[in-house]
Amino acid sequence: MGIISLNKASRLYWLGRYTERVYTGLKKVKPIYDAGVDGQEGDYAAYCRCLGIPGHYTDTVDFCKRYFFDRNDPNSLASSLAYAYDNAVVLRDTLTTDTLSYIQLAANAMEKAAQGDSPAVALQWVLDDILAFRGACEETIFEEETRSMIKLG
């Protein structure tokens, strides 16, 4: 059993927390997004209440656009992915460059989704890249404590 510094433990925890937030957020908001694509109103207000985030959106389309892609909103998935990337860069020596690259790929896919009119495919790439990141953590991080801190997040 090794010793992990408080700073490193914090970064590992938040890396796991932010990647989980993006993954779970995309999965849970999919029915709301689908409703918006179909021209219906999804129950985004209930989702916001459950997470304790401000429900200051005008409609389902506005919610999806801003919740997914507004990097100026600390509650958005794009912000969470940026925070995950920031932590991953600092932890490059622990994670390995190959593992870090999956977070970069997810960030690139999120950016591509934000720029397109039909973001569903690129958002699926974000999910795929986060799952690949998790798998890479299992395969390349040999210290159980380090892997556990990421999973704890």
Residue ranges of each PLM-predicted region?
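Alpha-helical transmembrane segments and their helix-helix packing motifs
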Residues: 1-153
